[in-house]
């Protein structure tokens, strides 16, 4: 697997678990980082909220479906050039989310 991944101004350094945007460090919550990495690993695939809850939060967690939405919104705020009009983390109506970076 690659040591880093770049989309737009965002660079994810997997070895350091570090995310930068235009050269500035972006502070992600641990679960936001895990979610971002999972989206990158599965780029181009539409992932349901239930699938993301299972894979990113794990079997033991009992978060609500809104948990995924809140974390996606957090990633968009921190990483998207225009969070209200996402370019990289897309909502696929009634199916889930897709990363296209």
Describe each PLM feature range.
Residues 7, 12-14, 99-101:
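Conserved catalytic Walker-motif region of ABC-type ATPase nucleotide-binding domains
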Residues 18, 23-95:
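Positively charged, aromatic-enriched patches within helix-turn-helix-type DNA-binding elements
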